[in-house]
Design a protein with these regions (language model features):
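Domain-level signal for soluble alpha/beta catalytic cores
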Residues: 1-149
Length: 149
């Protein structure tokens, strides 16, 4: 029997956890790269819009919730760039969520939501040089037809 997935629920202020693990991973990656000939390397990190797709029971609005997530992720984004890597923002949600939302939003509602996600991401990237960031938009991967791509 497969384990039951538990929905995430935000019940308090969002903070970044895992700085030590992140630093260890960045140091290990840097060490591994020291043994090969590369000009530059990137480290992927998830977009704020992909985190916290569960229930928000703490923040007053969806926008407050998303911006709190973005602020927490700024810690990770900055650490990646400070370690000398290019930061790759992975954001499958921009493309894949359109046909998964229930109830299905209008195109105007979807664009408004995605604009808010972009604004939150821009807040998280504030102060990080543009030439140290790349954005990866994909259509996600799931076991079903991609009818809305």
């Amino acid at each position: 029997m497969l384990p039951v997935a538990l929905a995430t629920v935000c019940t308090g202020p969002i903070t970044y956890k895992g700085e030590d693990t992140l630093q260890r991973d960045l140091e290990n990656f840097k060490s591994a790269l020291g043994r090969v000939n590369v000009e530059e390397a990137f480290v992927p990190s998830i977009a704020p819009s992909m985190i916290g797709r569960g229930q928000n029971k703490y923040y007053g609005t969806e926008q407050e919730y998303r911006f709190a997530i973005a602020q927490a992720m700024k810690t990770e984004y900055k650490a990646i760039v400070d370690a000398g890597f290019i930061l790759q923002i992975d954001d499958p949600g921009m493309g894949e969520t359109w046909d998964m939302m229930v109830p299905h939003p209008t195109l105007e509602e979807y664009r408004k939501l995605q604009a808010m996600y972009v604004e939150a991401l821009n807040q998280a990237l504030k102060g990080i040089p543009e030439d140290r960031v790349r954005y990866h938009l994909c259509w996600g991967s799931w076991q079903g037809p991609h009818l809305g791509d």
